[in-house]
Amino acid sequence: MNNIHKTAIIEEGAILGDNITIGAFTIIGKNVKIGDGTIIDSHTLIDGKTTIGKNNHIFSHASIGTIPQDLKFNGEDVELIIGDNNKIREYTLFNPGTIGGGSVTKIGSNNLFMGYVHVAHDCIIGDNCIFANGATLAGHVECDDFVVVGGLTPIHQFCKIGTQVMIGGASAVAQDIPPFCLAEGNKAVLRGLNLTGLRRRFDNREDIDAIKHAYRELFEVGKPLQDVARELLDNDKNKYVKELASFVLNTKRGIPFNRK
């Protein structure tokens, strides 16, 4: 049974699952789908072609699914897809995709979006990520799983953030950040590996040691970056090293590190 406040507006055509809570003065648009067990607090707007999974909690004054902040947008059929078990805090802003970027913004599951986080058009976000207050993702940004972005940090459009990356607060990210790395600063540069995150996630110490060795070879010894990445991809048997090397070889915006 759903618990919908009498002042909430649910437009005809919206599809609601079971055991959903919708607070006072919230507006749900006609093309919205909401999965079982989701809680939507008061004064929230969910609009556009938006699909929200199960057991999410969307806090007050969030704006979800309103048209993208792209001057080229002209009313095309675009959408926003949100997975399960996300916590989306106050004053967050999520936009759908554009036809220039695949027409979809996609957010995974088990993420925490703190207050005032903006996820712009065509972003792709994985699972188990944390975005602290005021983090800003411009259009077409991709974040893999287990990413942590500090407060008040903007990420430039088209940047890709690898798995298990941690980015410090009040940084400015303008290039791609490889998996397992720390980045910080304005402009953000690599500051080593996210060893705390790696130790929490990996039981096998050999994996961590292999990633450490690969990081040194790539970013600390002064060899040509692409050559080292290609050698690691071809010859190293560790799957995480291969993931790191492949990311470096396929970067579109470059890697921000201090060259020797």
From Swiss-Prot:
The keyword Cytoplasm applies. Its main location: cytoplasm. One of its GO terms (biological process) is lipid A biosynthetic process. Keywords: Acyltransferase, Cytoplasm, Lipid A biosynthesis, Lipid biosynthesis, Lipid metabolism, Repeat, Transferase. It is found in: Cytoplasm. InterPro entries: Acetyltransf_C (IPR029098), Acetyltransf_C_sf (IPR037157), Hexapep (IPR001451), Hexapep_transf_CS (IPR018357), Lipid_A_LpxA (IPR010137), Trimer_LpxA-like_sf (IPR011004). It catalyses: a (3R)-hydroxyacyl-[ACP] + UDP-N-acetyl-alpha-D-glucosamine = a UDP-3-O-[(3R)-3-hydroxyacyl]-N-acetyl-alpha-D-glucosamine + holo-[ACP]. CDD domains: LbH_UDP-GlcNAc_AT. Its EC number is 2.3.1.129. Pathway: Glycolipid biosynthesis; lipid IV(A) biosynthesis; lipid IV(A) from (3R)-3-hydroxytetradecanoyl-[acyl-carrier-protein] and UDP-N-acetyl-alpha-D-glucosamine: step 1/6. It comes from the Bacteria. GO terms for molecular function: acyl-[acyl-carrier-protein]-UDP-N-acetylglucosamine O-acyltransferase activity. One of its GO terms (cellular component) is membrane. Belongs to the transferase hexapeptide repeat family. LpxA subfamily. Involved in the biosynthesis of lipid A, a phosphorylated glycolipid that anchors the lipopolysaccharide to the outer membrane of the cell. Homotrimer. This is Acyl-[acyl-carrier-protein]--UDP-N-acetylglucosamine O-acyltransferase. It comes from Aliarcobacter butzleri (strain RM4018). The lineage of its organism: Bacteria, Pseudomonadati, Campylobacterota, Epsilonproteobacteria, Campylobacterales.
